[in-house]
Amino acid sequence: MTAIDTGAIDQASSVWQLRWRRFRRHRTAMASLVLLAALLLFVAAAGPLAALQGLDPDATDLLSRYDSPSAAHWLGTDEAGRDELLRLMYGGQMSLLVGIIATLVGGTVGLAIGLAAGYAGGRIDALLMRTTDGIIALPLLPLLIVLGAVDLTKLGFSSQFAHSGAAGFWRIVVIIALVDWTAMARLVRAAALSMKERDFVQAARASGAGPLYIVFAHILPNVTTPIIVAGTLTIGRVILFESVLSFLGFGIVPPTPSWGNMLNNAQEFVTTDPGLAIYPGLLIFLTVIAVNFLGDGLQHAFDPRSER
Amino acid sequence: MSALVELDQVSAHFTVRGSGWFGGAKQVLRAVDAVSLAIGEGETLALVGESGSGKSTLGQMVAGLRAPTLGSLRFRGGPFATKAARRAIQLVFQDPFSALDPRMPVSSLIAEPLVIQGIGTQAERRTRAALLVEQVGLPRDSLNRYPHEFSGGQRQRIAIARALAPEPALIVADEPLSALDVSIQSQILNLLKSIQEERRLSYLFISHDLGVVNHLADRVAVLYLGKLVELAPRAELFARPSHPYTQALLDAVPRIGRARRRQVALSGEMPSPLAPPPGCVFHTRCPKAQAICRAEIPLLAPAPGRPDQLAACHFKE
Amino acid sequence: MLRFILRRTAQTFLVLLVMSFVIYSLIGLMPGDPIDVMIAGNPGVTPAMVAHLREIYGLDQPLPLRYWHWLMAALGGDLGFSRTHSQPVLEVLGPALAQTAKLMLTGWSLSVVLAFILGTLAALKPGGKLDAAIGLFTFAGISVPVFWLALILVLVFAVTLHWLPASGMAGIDDGGIVDQLRHLALPVLTLALANTGTFTRYVRAAMIETMRMDFIRTARAKGLSEPRIVIGHALRNALIPVVTIMALSFGTLFSGALVTETMFAQFGMGKMIYDAILGNDYNLALSGLLFATLVTLASNLAADLAYGWLDPRISLR
């Protein structure tokens, strides 16, 4: 194997630069990146647009239900007379926020558990893996529903807090993270196990390095690639979870919009105003498919075979 | 003067769960069994044996990666599990492609032992890395590069530079040449020799290649199935091997243009370390085996007339 | 192997037991109170009567004790009474299970067939146009929210084309097989489409790997026609492991069924659990959830055992 870059001798051909080049070649992934950027702009425009139009996204107007698109309401109104476009934008903020934060929380938990199990090995590993396997084996949606139905006041929270929007948001983040960390844990554990035996880890140990040093200096940097790929794909999965839960009434509860709960009563208006049934789901679909393509592109870019 | 590293009846036993339908009883794998030897300052001790002999496990124990199940190790006459011992004993591996963290640039790789031991400031470490990189024969600009940009031989040089960084007294080299192309092997071998001469380093040189051992070693230790069967100065060992196993090993080395001295064919295969033969571990394959060999474990004792050469055989020559 | 089976089965029971406690506790955290629900709208109830009622139903006891009583009753076959259906829980579970089984089996079979067709077609020319198109379809399949897919299908087939009914189970006059099929069509289609994506990927990967193997090259050299090779040889080899993986996806399938049943007002396990939770029917919710857990765990166990049987490396652990 010879040095690859004979041209720029003093330039470090770092791993990340190689990856970016490979990623750029993956056209669907690049397109997805653009699509996601567009979606982010779309949801970010909610506040400014509301101010511009002078509208309150939560204001109901039962005299103007199911209105067609007009100058006042660019996409018409929904079943309670609220502006559909604004609700889509704010709903997007909620859905994306839950997606990202739940992924971060669940991912961190999974990372910690995977590292502990993979590096410590032995009894700790066995215990953690039994628990993980137990959770993986459960039917997810019924479990999420039961968790979502929990009455916070019975856990000691005040009634006011229990019914607030913040509680609803954090509840769904916690539930999803609680149930979704297993995929990350398994992945990280496998990576940690394979890293543990590598010679460079042994060399560090021979020089007197302790477990914490090894985990942070060697194992973590080497597992970032599978983590990033898995994390990206998790976001898609989490967005789908949130949408189902909100749709069934156990996630984000109205009046706060989320793409899922906007389809709450969709069966009622699928005949009167099909657009309302199409838009929120379409946005979920586009977001998730873009995220999945992005993850796929990242996976190809991080192909470890060319980086031995 | 106490030796640099002393091993006293050191054993490494692993418990293995049995196979079978209901899981058999636990068995003990004796990778290393009651080995005693010493490595002096500035000497190269070669550790020779076939795969399964336990030489790698022994090397791991000397490098501090594994604690012995029985027996003890001493560093300069004192305790072994100290920070100073870790600094003084460094390791070079067989597989250059696994020995370097692909995410770290060469400068960090070489300086890592210094970071772990807390030696020097960042600037000092960088300077030292630059010095070492040139001493192992690599260009200065290697410092900013990543392992995947280098060949096997070059990576091994980097690994050697890393081992030299904390100014060690002993380097445990576990088959450092085996994975390299033949033409590169001699380069690295010469590098190791010149480094030793400059710095008065000791080597524990683990190898199955007797040709290389002949080139580099001061003393040779021969392992079979975890037991030390012969320990002798290099010249004596090659001229007059005392233990039948050593004799067989030497006879197996092809020599161009010279007829074989004697035919000592070994019968059978190496037994499993899970079920070592009773008495002398070698008796199942030994052409000289007698009843006593099965009954009594031979101790390491000097060969007739050559007090420096120790062999564990009832019929040593 | 026997040890493996026993160990996995024991694990499954342990998880089920733990989950029964967890779910029992969670049900207790649901909004509302069994007593309040019972006395709802009854103005003549005094606090003394409420306390008395609590005593009778054992609701003043601590959680572990209540759980224990429930467990003992459940093991004896008594799962309690369903408040919303005015029937013993067991009598409600039976028909619901049958309905869900109908839906899931049909949906799963359709998915499998579609997946094998699409996956094989995609594997014939990896990287080609057909493969790319199918790839797009699979990505769409794993990215689409099931409930929205159901809505779209309803929009297309029921509202616009009027070919199929939008919901419900059978006509008022219980019009025989054709009517039942018409009502089953959209839910099955929804479920199938949602899962075909993942299954197709498995089949494609397995087929690509199988087609690369030497025995396929031999078959070609023998002069067999391509369709014969693909279907007779490659597909048959890829069949068992792939189907095993598909069986493992039972959990996801069940979640999809839950949503589909709710959307199409089909009275299966999913809708039963959902309604029970919304209606504070604690006994039914608890039993339904546990049953769903049991079935998922059992199918995972079956798949694990099949895997272990197929792959001799695993079964010897």
Regions found by a protein language model. Give the residues of each.
Chain B
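Conserved ABC ATPase "signature" region
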Residues: 124-141, 194, 250-251
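Short catalytic/signature loops enriched in Gly
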Residues: 3, 16-23, 28, 231-317
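P-loop NTP-binding/switch modules centered on Walker-like glycine-rich loops
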Residues: 172, 176-261
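Conserved ABC ATPase signature
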Residues: 146-150, 154
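A short, proline-enriched helix->beta-strand linker immediately N-terminal to the Walker B motif
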Residues: 165-169
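Conserved ABC transporter NBD signature motif
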Residues: 71-81, 85
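Helix-to-loop junction immediately C-terminal to a conserved catalytic motif
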Residues: 63
